[in-house]
Design a protein with these regions (language model features):
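Catalytic and substrate-binding clefts that recognize carbohydrates or anionic sugar/phosphate headgroups
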Residues: 1-118, 127-129, 134, 141-146, ...
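Aromatic-lined carbohydrate-binding/catalytic grooves of carbohydrate-active enzymes
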Residues: 16, 115-249
Length: 250
C-alpha cells in the first residue's frame, strides 16, 4: 500500500470507465474487469481497468500492477489518499507536467500510443440493449437518414447470437443477415456486433468443434477447456484469440 498527502483543495480525475462524478475525490475504486449488466450509477468495478489518474496539482500516477488494485481518494482520512495491490510488485510512475495535456502525453509515451481508428469509428454510433432484430435495424437506419441525423454505426447487441454467447446469428430475428449488412452498408452504415470472447455450451456443435481444435483456453489444473460461468449464455468456453488460426475460424 502507498500513501500520499491529500491537500484540502486537491481533485482527482481518471481511472477510465467508472460510474459517478468526474472528480474522484471522496470515493474508492477497484481495478477488476467485470461484466456488469444493467449496472447502477454507483456500481464498481466495471468492464475496463485503467489504473492511471491525474491530480489538479499537475501530476499523474500510473500503477503498473495487474492484481485487484484499489484506489482510495480520501475515504479513510482527510490527510491522505492511498492505492494498494494484494500481490505483485508495487511499481508506479509519478508523472509531472505543466497541464493535463502534457501529463497525458508522457503517460502515452510510457504505455504506448494507440493507433488512430478509421474515420467512421469516430462518428456517432447507435447502440441500445434491445437492438437485436433485422426489422428494427432497418427501421432505425431509415429513421436516421429520413431525419437527416448523422450516424455512422449501428450496433447489434448480444441478442444477435443464437445462444447469447456464440458466433451464429439468431435465426428467428435475422432472416437474411448477409443482405442486411449489405443494405446498411449501401445506406452508409457500418455494423458492429456485440461479442464476448466465449462460446456457450448450449451451442453444443460449435463448442465441441472449438474444443476439438484446441481453440479454447485450458484450465491449468485439469488440462481441459476452462468452464467459465457467464452472466448470460450459461457455462461457456473462453476462446483463445492468441492463436492466429482462431481469427479465421471465428
Amino acid at each position: 500500500m502507498e500513501y500520499k498527502t491529500l491537500r484540502r483543495d486537491e481533485h482527482f480525475f481518471g481511472l477510465g470507465e467508472k460510474t459517478g462524478k468526474l472528480d474522484r475525490r471522496g470515493e474508492s475504486y477497484k481495478m477488476w474487469n467485470s461484466d456488469k449488466p444493467c449496472y447502477s450509477v454507483v456500481e464498481d468495478p466495471l468492464y475496463k481497468s485503467i489504473p492511471f489518474f491525474m491530480s489538479s496539482y499537475r501530476y499523474g500516477i500510473f500503477l503498473d500492477n495487474t492484481y485487484k488494485t484499489e484506489f482510495k481518494f480520501g475515504t479513510e482520512s482527510r490527510d491522505y489518499y492511498s492505492f494498494e495491490a494484494p500481490g505483485g510488485e508495487m511499481i508506479y510512475y509519478f508523472i509531472f507536467g505543466k497541464d493535463y495535456k502534457e501529463i497525458m502525453k508522457q503517460y502515452v509515451a510510457l504505455t504506448g500510443q494507440p493507433i488512430m481508428p478509421p474515420k467512421w469509428a469516430l462518428g456517432f454510433a447507435q447502440c441500445r440493449g434491445l437492438l437485436t432484430t433485422e426489422k428494427l435495424s432497418y427501421e432505425i437506419a431509415e429513421g436516421y437518414r429520413k431525419r437527416g441525423i448523422p450516424c455512422d454505426i449501428i450496433y447489434q447487441d448480444i441478442g444477435w447470437t443464437q445462444y447469447l454467447q456464440d458466433f451464429n446469428w439468431r435465426k428467428e430475428n435475422y432472416q437474411n443477415p448477409k443482405k442486411m449488412l449489405a443494405d446498411l452498408k449501401g445506406m452508409g452504415f457500418k455494423v458492429i456486433v456485440s461479442q464476448d470472447p466465449v462460446i456457450s455450451q448450449a451451442n453444443k456443435k460449435q463448442w465441441e468443434e472449438a474444443d476439438r481444435l484446441g481453440y479454447l483456453v485450458k484450465d491449468s489444473t485439469t488440462g481441459k477447456s476452462y468452464d467459465m460461468p457467464w452472466p448470460w449464455g450459461g457455462n461457456c468456453g473462453v476462446v483463445d484469440f492468441t492463436i492466429p488460426e482462431v481469427a479465421d475460424w471465428g
